[in-house]
Amino acid sequence: MKKKMILGALAILMLLPVHAQIAWKQVEPGVWKGVVGTPEDYSLLDVAAVTPLKESFARLPEVALPALANEIVGSIQDGKTSLRIPLQKKEQLYGFGLNFQTVHQRGKILNLHVDHYGGKDNGRTHAPVPFYISSLGYGVFINSARYLTVYAGSGARKDSPNAPVAKDRNTDKTWTASPYSDAVSTLVPAPGAEIYIFAGPTPMDVFRRYNLFCGGGTLPPRWGL
């Protein structure tokens, strides 16, 4: 009986999420890398095989690691990685790859999945990218080749210090299907993930750092302008 109780307790512990502390390492000026769990060998940066344009980073302003880095939470459960990145009240989000109808991405649920465009900017498109820029002057890139699910300020949590008040949709006219959310929550279907933070100070500087980090990009064809 005692042995069964011990085995049962171990089984329960295995089901509980393992919270990982993220240590940030500067890899380029204004660019930091963090690791949660054990990332897979196959990743977007490995496949792209790009080399950052190191000399060009010197032209950008010196910046410190954004304060929100210390508030990013990573956890692993059932072989999947969850990342939670804080959001401020009026913060706006841009990015996540190709979108045909929208610019502002906060408040959406995105399934970043390479697919034909189905008429909605929901992440299933020709070129989804796990990278976004904040209006506060920082960017986040998740280096995973998996199909990611992103709650871009659209998931409310009971344990949040800013948790919305529970309301009865049948009796309360102020009930909403989209209550306030104070975080970007991303599910990576893998036992680990690499996450990169790009500092600004402006959103344009964030984009410049991301572009330089990914090799500098190429000049688009004239017909694509």
Feature-to-residue mapping (PLM):
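Positively charged n-region of N-terminal signal peptides that target proteins for export
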Residues: 1-4
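Hydrophobic alpha-helical segments and their boundary regions
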Residues: 6-9, 84-86
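Bacterial N-terminal signal peptides
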Residues: 8-17
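Catalytic and substrate-binding clefts that recognize carbohydrates or anionic sugar/phosphate headgroups
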Residues: 21-222
